[in-house]
Amino acid sequence: GQWVPQISSKRLGLVVDGVTFGYPEIMADFQTLKARYPQAFMVKSDDYTNFSGKDFWVTLVATSFGTADETNAWCDQQGFAEQDCYASRLMHTGGPAGNSKTR
């Protein structure tokens, strides 16, 4: 499968930099990212087997790469902080093992 950059994951009640995320904050986060990356899309973590966390709204970029390292290099080139972008592979079968690689 192809690797894509995961650039955000938020769930209800999550607190980041003093902001408590509800639906409006999750959507605002997505819209901000989509303005910078028009190919960004959002999925619910429960709909895919590669995510270990449940109830997350995950923003990914529809720019695919053959390897996790290539994906993470894209994250570096875009200037993302290490924890804000990493390689992910969307899967409907299997589990999280081997389907994400942090930087």
Where do the model's predicted regions map?
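Acidic/polar low-complexity segments and flexible, solvent-exposed patches
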Residues: 1-103
